[in-house]
Amino acid sequence: MDLLDAHLVPAVDGVAFGLLLFVVAAGLSLAFGTAGVLNLSHGTLYAIGAYTGAELSDGTWGGLALGLAAGTAAACVAGAGLSAATAPLARRGHLAQALLTFGLALIGGDLLIQVFGADELPVRVPEALDTSVTLLGHRYPAYRLCFIVMAVLLAACGTWVLTRTRMGAAVRAAADDPQMLAATGRNPRAVHTGVLAAAGALAGAAGVLGAPIIGPGPGTSENVLMLSLVVVVLGGLRSLWATFFAAIAVGEVQTLGVSLAPDLAPYLLFAAMAAVLVLRSRFAEPAAAHGPEGAAPDPVARLRSRLVAVLRRRPLPAWANRLPGGPAWRQAAPLLVLLLVLVSLPALLDAYSISLAGSALALGLLAVSVTVLTGYAGLPTLGQTAPFAVGAYATANLAEAGWTVGPVQLVLSALAAAVFALVVGPAVIRARGTTVLMITLAIGELTGAVVNQLKSVTGGADGLVGFPATRALWGGEEMLEESRLYTYALVVAVVAVSVTLLVLRSPAGKLLTGTRGAEARMRASGHPVGRYLLVAHICAGALAGVGGSLMVTVQQYLSPADVGFEIAAFALLAVVIGGTTSVIGALLGAGLIVATRDWVAGSWPGHGPLLLGVLFVATVYLLPRGLAGLRGGPGGGNGESGPPSDTTGAPGTPGAPGALGVTSASGASAAEDQPPSAPAPTSAGKASP
């Protein structure tokens, strides 16, 4: 009884927190389950409401009502705008949506900070609620009790609208049978826009009412997004009641769980998320990949097609046609030019720019590992920062222990990352499409929780700094100058990329490509597809570990932000910029991202996220097949292809409610997802004609 009494307040806090998450997650579930939009800017919609409500709060009921109306309306308009923004991506899958909405989240977050400031805003609740009441012998904030009532009413109203009104019937029809909805004379695109507007309104209302609980400030949008994703995954997309109970469970873990088991609670949420996704992926049925009825034409298609046509029609320069060796030499010439430019950078740039170039090489190796998984194995990932973090912290701890020889650090870090990839690989390789994207996200976030909690190894939130510098070889001096560090990073990157290219262009690489393009045929031919994917996952993990080791060597410090979700999104963006099967393109994309984040943003201080967000958006719209797709035939020549569409329904596809876990373990891809250079190998391991 004493134990129950001691934890009563955290338990009630968990109910309030869970109801807040339910309102937010209901909007996210509505957007994803009905409109088919994987909205990674949903936390920003919450932040819009929270900032607006905090700014208009003045301690009166009128201020609360005005803030609720304004915040809900602003987020509703933003949700409707999101419908227009995602319309051009109607048949490109959830990966393109994720990149676009993450870019919009960066832009929105930067604009909110510019308008409201970088500090967390205070929220003034009405004076009548700015007090405490007695609850079973404990003093408890009156506003939180009032919020519980308001959240229950809001949830009840939303459930009634969805299940008892003609509007709700149209929404359900859009999810279950869009063709029938169109036959009744309703415009599915209008329903799609209305659903996203309603999802935004829910997030905005939750932001206004929940601002005293999760206040508006830096990191709010990402925190709300991650918790909402956990709720949606645990509760599923078909049942509001399941979402409700999942939200309450998450709220209790965040409050009561921290009170009862503070060391265990940080790991529970994302571990449960990964476990649920893995189980669903094993018992799911394949989903049809189809586009929305009445999808609007791509407003940037003509601009993009003209750009591609111009670049493809440009003949090679006369000097290129005179190069010896024929087409093979001309294909290698750009690589040699790139290498020449990289080698000459120390003579052309200042020390700071050289250090940025070294960081770009480290991020580039991470991006190349994502290329192996996304472009060749067909496993789009947002969690490759996990083996990247293993390699980085392994190198930092080796340096602290006196193991400062570079090759030793690289080998041991790659080995540690490979072992990590081996352990988590079985959970990843059975899933496909959006499911694997969410599983890898959960693994990445779980690794981030370990980084923050395991202070004896990682330094926690403070990170690691002050460890000895790396020596290039046995008996060598410590590398302290930026030029020496860059040269070391360049040598490591050249070796790693060369090995990767040799493997990908070998028969083993052809087999791996076949697992993405014609998995069912390969299985029928007797190929152990699961084994191929597991080996690819291990090798990609080792490569990411080398990148993490290189980052620590170049930076000479390490913090959780260096291995967080944002870095995972940057790596995926680098892959899309270059073309998902272009290793060199991934390196170029990483260089462009680092230049935008650290060099261009230096001339416009405080606006790095805005510039990166613009880069995300521009890449998704203008480079659907990356830089590699601008020259050559379909797919960008030489087998280059755009980002693989997931198999769970296209953006705006009302039939996407099963996206989290409905794809079969065999993972047959949609036809549009098959790269031109991926014929199914025969049982002898050769490509079939």
Locate predicted features.
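Short amphipathic alpha-helical coupling elements at transmembrane boundaries
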Residues: A87, R91, A170-A183, T513-G514, ...
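Alpha-helical membrane-interface segments at transmembrane helix boundaries
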Residues: L8-L19, A87, G137-R139, L234, ...
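Short, strongly hydrophobic alpha-helical membrane anchors
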Residues: M1-V9
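Transmembrane alpha-helices and adjacent helix-loop boundaries
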Residues: D5, F17-L20, L66, A80-G81, ...
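Transmembrane alpha-helix interface/packing and boundary motifs in multi-pass membrane proteins
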Residues: L28-L38, I214, V230-S239, S369-L379, ...
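Transmembrane helix boundary and interhelical loop/hinge segments in multi-pass membrane proteins
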Residues: V161-A169, A173-D177, V503-G509, T515
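Hydrophobic alpha-helical segments
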Residues: L229, G236, I248-A271, V276-V278
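Non-cytoplasmic
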Residues: G27-L38, G204-T220, V230, G545-P560
